[in-house]
């Protein structure tokens, strides 16, 4: 089972340069730890500093090598030609394979702030993804109808490798869409182990219906790997007790190296091939230490 990293993009900082520096340091730590992939997220109209995906990933790739990297795009909030152009440039900067993570997105505030009707998300998503795929294959694209009409659109540079698409989804219709349209489904960080098993079964059934074979089966987890049990008690347990992101505590992966390895091994036994981790603590030194120890977790899982 591979372990990648999705870097936290939002920071409550007095100096906005500190948040960007924290992301660079975390990417460097993930590279040094030998993690298998690097990703950043996508959100808009935020009260706290949120470092936007295309720009920050371009910087983070300087810390990365030929291992896969990518970014999440909430497709209903973007014009597909613009996304395809961003992907083409990022894929040219990356030394390895570029992965597009995408999702419908949520939150009335960001949709209202971007002037997009949240009720139109599914149709906008499917139309955008189709155009992005075609552009990233090097096609000239004309679309007469729908939410994104374009005439004679093309991009350069085109990604040097075929674009791999992971679709994040939670509701049954969205999981079916991920099976129908994606190369992989990305399971969410809010899922408890029992929910993760149930949704994986739904996804497998949908893949069978649509005659699709996924390239991988990734799941997102929010984690903290402590050096000792006292470290876990000091840094992670207060965050969990405070109701981290409104998640069920069973969805969070917290413990020492051996404990976290055991928790993640369960997902491999279910059939997940990749775990994409994000640090649940804000303290930068603690997060960097946890990232380094995720590398130790990875080694334990590889040796098992």
For the regions a protein language model found, what residue spans apply to each?
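Active-site mouth loops of central-metabolism enzymes
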Residues: 6-21, 71-80, 159-170, 246-258
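Hydrophobic faces of well-ordered beta-strands that scaffold small-molecule active sites
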Residues: 3-7, 38-40, 68-71, 98-102, ...
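Alpha-helix-loop-beta-strand connector modules within alpha/beta enzyme cores
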Residues: 51-73, 124-131, 135, 291-304
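Active-site-adjacent beta->alpha loops and helix N-cap segments on the catalytic face
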Residues: 49-56, 191-206, 283-289
């Amino acid at each position: 089972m591979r372990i990648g990293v999705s870097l936290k993009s939002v920071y409550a900082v007095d100096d906005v340069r500190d948040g960007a520096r924290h992301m660079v340091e975390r990417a460097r730590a993930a590279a040094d730890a030998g993690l298998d992939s690097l990703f950043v997220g996508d959100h808009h109209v935020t009260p706290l500093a949120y470092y936007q995906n295309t720009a920050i990933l371009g910087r983070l790739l300087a810390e990365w090598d030929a291992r896969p990297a990518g970014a999440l795009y909430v497709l209903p909030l973007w014009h597909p030609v613009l996304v395809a152009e961003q992907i083409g440039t990022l894929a040219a900067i990356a030394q390895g394979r570029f992965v597009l993570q995408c999702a419908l997105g949520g939150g009335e505030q960001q949709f209202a702030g971007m002037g997009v009707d949240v009720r139109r998300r599914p149709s906008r998503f499917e139309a955008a993804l189709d155009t992005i795929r075609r552009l990233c294959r090097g096609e000239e694209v004309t679309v007469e109808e729908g939410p994104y009409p374009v005439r004679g659109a093309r991009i350069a540079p085109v990604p040097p490798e075929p674009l791999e698409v992971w679709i994040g989804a939670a509701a049954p219709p969205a999981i079916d869409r991920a099976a129908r349209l994606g190369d992989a489904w990305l399971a969410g960080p809010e899922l408890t182990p029992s929910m993760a098993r149930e949704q994986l079964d739904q996804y497998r059934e949908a893949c069978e219906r649509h005659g699709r074979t996924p390239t991988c089966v990734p799941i997102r987890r929010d984690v903290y790997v402590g050096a000792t049990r006292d470290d876990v008690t000091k840094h992670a347990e207060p965050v969990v007790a405070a109701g981290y992101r409104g998640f069920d505590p069973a969805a969070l992966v917290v413990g020492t190296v051996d404990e976290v390895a055991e928790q993640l091994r369960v997902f491999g036994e279910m059939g997940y091939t990749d775990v994409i981790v994000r640090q649940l603590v804000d303290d930068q030194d603690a997060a960097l230490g946890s990232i380094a120890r995720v590398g130790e977790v990875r080694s334990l899982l590889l040796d098992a």
